[in-house]
Amino acid sequence: MIDNKSLNGYLTWAEIDLKAIARNVQAVKKRLDPTVGVMAVVKANAYGHGAVEVARAALAAGAEWLAVNRVEEGVALRQAGIEARTLVLGYCPPGQAGLVVEHNITPAVTTLDTAEALAERAQQLDREFVIHVKIDTGMGRLGLLPEEAVDFVGALAEFSGLKIEGVFSHLATADDPDPSFSRRQLQVYQDVTQALEAAGIEIPLHHLANSAAGLQLPETHHHLVRLGVAMYGLTPSIKLDLPVELRPAMTLKTRVARLRVLPAGAAVGYGRTFVAPEPTAVALAPVGYGDGYPRLCSNRGEMLVRGQRARVIGAVSMDQTSLDVSGIDDVSQDDEIVVFGRQGEAEISAEDVARWAETINYEIVTRLAARVPRIYLE
């Protein structure tokens, strides 16, 4: 963790508010039945925020489980000393069965080849190893088709050393104000779990809800809510009227690397896509698509300088972006620039950047490059 006093040495950095992470977990948890747990989703480096630090903050705030997408992500948590229950949501290939068992990570099993490899390693270690089974109820990605579930789970029972602890699915449209398809998926999921019970197969943990369903559809909560984007203070959808106030955890900052006045007729950036119509004060921000700032923000995005919005002019390049600071008083070399987040009373949200980049807020934070230091505020 980097001491905040050393920030003067950075050109571009992200500040991660761990108190915001904790507050968001607690705000959602308060809305859940006491019997419902929280699974904090820290895949993709915790949506760009830093998996180890976010995992610790979420667990301290009351999350009972962690979720990742790849086995390597779970191993990294273990190597950092985090021993909380951790589910791999994505595909676990047979070749990684040893890693999963040895690090006590819970896999989502969707093939018998993986199950066989897990069982073999569990037997070698003389252990009973727990797994979860994923059902595709309408997402059309990873998971068993509903009609395959009973036979597949029955086949899993033939593998000595494996215990099926959980069955889960994922909602495709929980972020849509119209809940009809989510409820259709819920019905498919319930049909599967009832068929398993009728076959004499008891699975103790059921989970279906993501952030949007966790906040909007209590009938989907079951035993666990998988808290992803909302934990980071981002709305699952700008179309939803959320029942809790979320606090964004990430602020992306840079600083004025050069300040000058371009004469009328001078161009900025690759392709000369901006030509100054009049003398224009330009601040150079040392941030670009190499840091994760979208090139689609060229000539349309904005950043905050001295609490005011400054327009992006010219093409966003790999390492630098130019801003029109005409009309903003007292801008100086090395002044702080907020790419997204708050500066004084002003704010540019990840949703704003997503709108300019024609994408979603999830992508804006997740794409933040590894070369951008994360500074953790506690």
What residue spans do the PLM features occupy?
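Active-site-proximal beta-alpha core segment in soluble small-molecule metabolic enzymes
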Residues: 2, 7-8, 12-15, 22-23, ...
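C-terminal helical cap(s) of enzyme catalytic domains, especially alpha/beta-barrels
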Residues: 18, 75-80, 239-246
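Solvent-exposed alpha-helices and their adjacent loops that cap or buttress functional pockets
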Residues: 32, 100, 123-125, 132, ...
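Flexible, glycine/charged-enriched surface loops at secondary-structure junctions
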Residues: 35, 202-205, 347-354
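A structural signal for short, hydrophobic beta-strand segments that form beta-sheets
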Residues: 88, 164, 256, 312-313
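Catalytic metal-binding/acid-base residues of hydrolase active sites
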Residues: 138, 172, 212, 230, ...
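Anionic-ligand-binding alpha/beta catalytic cores of soluble enzymes and soluble regulatory domains
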Residues: 178-280
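C-terminal accessory subdomain/extension
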Residues: 261-378
